[in-house]
A protein has these predicted regions:
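Hinge/cleft segment of the Venus flytrap/periplasmic-binding protein
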Residues: 1-28, 184, 277-342
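Extracytoplasmic "Venus flytrap"
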Residues: 1-48, 52, 61-74, 79, ...
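Hydrophobic alpha-helical
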Residues: 88-107, 180, 198-262
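Short, solvent-exposed amphipathic alpha-helices that sit
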Residues: 41-55, 138-145, 171-193, 208, ...
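Short beta-strand elements in bilobed, periplasmic/extracellular small-molecule ligand-binding domains
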Residues: 54-67, 160-163, 184-207
Length: 342
């Protein structure tokens, strides 16, 4: 029997999950730096940050980092300080990669927003969208999508599941895996065997990104489910078919444009994707700075709320996708502007 914990059930994303007006008006004339490491998710975050800073009348400078070079994040903090930024948004980076630059930034009066990570950070750093909570919830919600599919297609017998870990982004992937594995254990018990494929970033972004998954399915050819991330899914189905392997049911998290297009095609190759509105996340990141500067006791009001996400299937994907990207909740810009009193 498959059990689904409703605590992690997905619901239609009609709002941000709360309404938290500022105590004081949002400040004017701020200069914000955004660290762009070239990752496809970061590019989407940047779009939201651009929208939000424009709405506030703030200046935005984009500072480049290299996701394959750990030291580039610290250099990005230094460059942000040299550019005269009042705040810098650092998405999905390991804290150790820029920790040594934090004291110098604080002395200059520059605050750092650590966004979308599970880092434990020190003074001078504001956490927004903590992956310890939000990505854990994402993993558990993804497990519920799997359990629902299992109830229909694998009501009895053992089930083999392959998941993915990208070591360079462990602070994001680990909470997802923790939430997923716990929820699968609760809902499926000993029936489900969960394995994890280590997909190094250099391979995931290289000429043969599917090699680790092909090898994993060669070891376990009867795999029933492959849990993917949008950034690791490139060319997976074609690679498995070319290797003569059975293509398992693919359920993923954080789809990018190629996965969303696939869901909308006449013959989708994946079952479902638990989607996050990454452009909206950029607004959350700017919200962290707004509250830091405007409120007497700044805090992240979103830290204890369920993440904004939805399970996208071929049957409903068109309801939640706008211009090739997940765009929800509807009117999110106006919701933030109302809280910011602009």
């Amino acid at each position: 029997m498959v059990e689904i914990d409703q605590k992690f059930a997905l619901s239609t994303p009609t709002g941000l999950g709360g309404n938290f007006p500022l105590k004081h008006d949002a400040p004017k004339g701020k200069h914000v730096c955004f660290v762009d490491n070239g990752n496809q998710y970061t590019e989407l975050f940047r779009q939201g940050v651009k929208q939000a800073t424009t709405a506030l009348g703030w200046r935005l400078t984009v500072i480049q980092a290299d996701q394959n070079v750990a030291s580039s994040y610290g250099s990005a903090v230094t460059s942000s300080a040299q550019a005269g930024c009042d705040g810098v948004i650092m998405p999905s980076a390991q804290y150790a990669n820029y920790q040594s630059q934090v004291p110098g930034a604080a002395k200059r009066g520059m605050v750092i927003v650590d966004a979308n990570s599970s880092n434990k950070v020190g003074k001078g750093v504001v956490k927004v969208l903590s992956a310890s909570k939000l990505q854990y919830y994402e993993g558990a919600a993804t497990a519920n999508v799997v359990l629902k599919h299992m109830a229909e297609h694998h009501p009895k017998g053992d089930v083999t599941i392959q998941t993915v870990m990208v070591p360079q982004f462990e602070n994001v992937f680990k909470p997802i895996l923790d939430g997923f594995k716990r929820q699968i254990a609760v809902g499926c018990g000993a029936r489900c065997k969960v394995y994890t494929v280590n997909d190094d970033l250099s391979v995931a972004t290289g000429p043969n990104p599917s090699a680790p998954f092909v090898a994993a399915l060669q070891r376990n050819p009867e795999t029933d489910y492959m849990i993917q991330s949008g950034v690791t899914d490139s060319g997976l189905v074609a690679a498995l078919q070319q290797a003569g392997l059975k293509v398992p049911a693919i359920i993923g998290t954080a789809p990018l444009q190629s996965q969303l297009r696939d869901l909308q095609s006449s013959h989708p190759t994946t079952v479902a994707w638990v989607a996050q509105p990454f452009i909206t996340y950029g607004w959350f990141m700017v919200d962290g700075l707004v509250r830091y500067w405007a409120d007497d006791k700044p805090y992240d009001p979103w830290a204890h709320l369920p993440d904004v996400k939805w399970a996208l299937y071929p049957s409903n994907v068109k309801d939640f996708v706008d211009g090739g990207q997940s765009a929800f909740p509807k009117g999110y810009q106006q919701l933030f502007e109302s809280m910011w009193k602009i």
